[in-house]
Amino acid sequence: MSHLVKMENGQSQTIQEMLGCIERYNPDHLKILESYVQDQAKNNTYDLEANLAVLKLYQFNPHMLNFDITYTILLKCLTNLPHTDFVMAKCLLLPQQMKDENVQTIIDLADILERADFTLFWQRAEVNRTMFRHISGFHDSIRKFVSHVVGITFQTIKKDLLKELLGGIEDSTLESWIKRNGWKHQGQDLVVVATQDDKIKTKNITEKIEFENVGALMAQCI
């Protein structure tokens, strides 16, 4: 859905154009930006700059604060881990937002993800599932982050453990994630995440530089 922002001169701009000028701080545009946040949740899209602009407008206009939009923005930030979007959004929260019980729950979920305690995350997510049921693709976005962590942590992993880390998924769903990440089966119980050849090999390179090679350059610096 296209969102156009009407300026005082009667002309219209896209949200991206509006965010590039001083109009981003105009509270008259907040409702359109909030609607844009809701569309991101519905359509599994993401615009960090617009979402941070909403939180900034709340800072300047605390009487316009919308907690439901705040929750959605924070949860959308979680879907973009391992990027630091959540940290940036958290830094823009007002004291009354930080004291909110649901905000604290989301912060706790973020902390759990950051320390890669994925089993606990899925347990907490199940308890609080109504909080993000309106966010399309939320679970798969988290699984994408889990896959990233698994990919840089393991060479091989037991299938049962991998299923648990990905949220207790079924075998058929596991197969799709194995294929998506380019992993392979090893026997009945193991999944090969990375072979030794896939690991980046570092090499120390020492180059011998003779004085004559830099003499002319040093002379120019004197």
From Swiss-Prot:
GO cellular component terms?
eukaryotic 43S preinitiation complex; eukaryotic 48S preinitiation complex; eukaryotic translation initiation factor 3 complex
User: What's one Pfam family here?
Assistant: CSN8_PSD8_EIF3K
Q: Look up the record and give one Gene Ontology term from the biological process aspect.
A: formation of cytoplasmic translation initiation complex
Query: Which InterPro entries does the entry mention?
Result: ARM-type_fold, CSN8_PSD8_EIF3K, eIF3k, PCI_dom, Transl_init_fac_sub12_N_euk, WH-like_DNA-bd_sf, WH_DNA-bd_sf
Which keywords has UniProt assigned to this entry? Cytoplasm, Initiation factor, Protein biosynthesis
What is the annotated localization of this protein? Cytoplasm
Q: Which Gene3D superfamilies match?
A: ARM repeat, domain 1, Winged helix-like DNA-binding domain superfamily/Winged helix DNA-binding domain
Where does the PCI domain start and stop, copy by copy?
Answer: 46-208
GO molecular-function term, one example from the UniProt record: translation initiation factor activity
Question: What family is this?
Answer: Belongs to the eIF-3 subunit K family.
What does the protein in this record do?
Component of the eukaryotic translation initiation factor 3 (eIF-3) complex, which is involved in protein synthesis of a specialized repertoire of mRNAs and, together with other initiation factors, stimulates binding of mRNA and methionyl-tRNAi to the 40S ribosome. The eIF-3 complex specifically targets and initiates translation of a subset of mRNAs involved in cell proliferation.
Instruction: Please describe the quaternary structure of this protein.
Output: Component of the eukaryotic translation initiation factor 3 (eIF-3) complex. The eIF-3 complex interacts with pix.
Name-wise, this protein is: Eukaryotic translation initiation factor 3 subunit K
- Organism, by scientific name, is Drosophila mojavensis (Fruit fly)
